[in-house]
């Protein structure tokens, strides 16, 4: 980051672990909630592309949970996005960033690219390690010592012991860890009631847990009782000034060449799928749409009988439509309205769950039918980072554009009829559908498995908003 950029003071820390499954989400979410209860305004962030953890962060902090991903955003955008999240909707006192996987685990073959350590180094943020000691005692200190010296850019500023068996066990481990020069900030007793249940893609979204609010409150109580919050805040305050300027949706659109159309109506409505079946979308998507003059309106495909009044664009993000297939299938009126809107040329972006929802059916349950394709649940997890190529002009990309994205699903979509071209090429393989269902001479439907973060590709938001601004409401 340039030395010419004014320094921003933002206390911050990263919560990481040596491995997956150590309890990062439990500790990070509980820590955010405990700090909030102690009077701090906390900005919650997730390293990596995951949608689920930020939902818990939002419950814990009372503000949007946000992502920081080196692949999706690029190295230079992480600081600006962190500062943006920490200043909206109001200035935060500190930022807590939950890592992904193990501290040094990143893109395969990338030597740690996009790892939590990569994020921590770019943000010059101290790291607090969550160490699962359920099957270890003094050997945990060797793990901490190794993590501390593996990469000299990383400062391990503290350890929180998780799943300790007794006070004696905690004291034994803490003594060994502190002997290698790393302070122990807390020790959490083993408590199965604090675990976050798993879904086939990872954790269960907060929106799907009726008891989520109570669970987060319980986490806050347990963390406050067993972790030294004052010491945690001091770790966050030890982070140096950050040489970056907060990201701006307006500036991002301007840089992408977006210019409001003179004939644009006042704030055209973009219908954004929400509810329990569609929980996966990044906060910056709606912020970019608002900055472009659109009015995002969230609707629930499971229960709403119609699209929002004046819909001129549709955004169907990710989620679990296969889990709620019966409920989605039962909302015949909404499925019909959505199919008619897509076929009439209303600009529509559908990612992963949105792609499935637009199919004719998913595992036999009738869906929207805007695509002549069927979706099926499988046992195989397809995931990875991609630099997607637009093979032709689409609703969100110009021919030849490269856009960063990621996939994460256990389903397949099979075309059962003639479709238009693919939405993207992923490592040379076609993915999704780009089509002109109304025959107006340009693509108005973009449906694929690829998840994109529009802060990292604002040209996608700009193109979509431009199409929406000239669309006649359905």
From Swiss-Prot:
A Pfam family it matches: CbiA
InterPro entries: CbiA/CobB_synth (IPR004484), Class_I_gatase-like (IPR029062), CobQ/CobB/MinD/ParA_Nub-bd_dom (IPR002586), GATase_3 (IPR011698), P-loop_NTPase (IPR027417)
Cofactors (names): Mg(2+)
Domain (GATase cobBQ-type) ranges: 269-459
Site, as annotated: Increases nucleophilicity of active site Cys: 451
Pathway(s) this gene product operates in, as recorded in its UniProt entry: Cofactor biosynthesis; adenosylcobalamin biosynthesis; cob(II)yrinate a,c-diamide from precorrin-2 (aerobic route): step 9/10
Keywords in alphabetical order: ATP-binding, Cobalamin biosynthesis, Glutamine amidotransferase, Ligase, Magnesium, Nucleotide-binding
Catalytic residues as annotated in Swiss-Prot or TrEMBL: 352 (nucleophile)
The keyword Transcription regulation is annotated on this UniProt entry: no
PROSITE patterns: GATASE_COBBQ
HAMAP family recorded: CobB_CbiA
Record's miscellaneous remark: The a and c carboxylates of hydrogenobyrinate are activated for nucleophilic attack via formation of a phosphorylated intermediate by ATP. CobB catalyzes first the amidation of the c-carboxylate, and then that of the a-carboxylate.
The family this protein is said to belong to: Belongs to the CobB/CbiA family.
Protein name: Hydrogenobyrinate a,c-diamide synthase
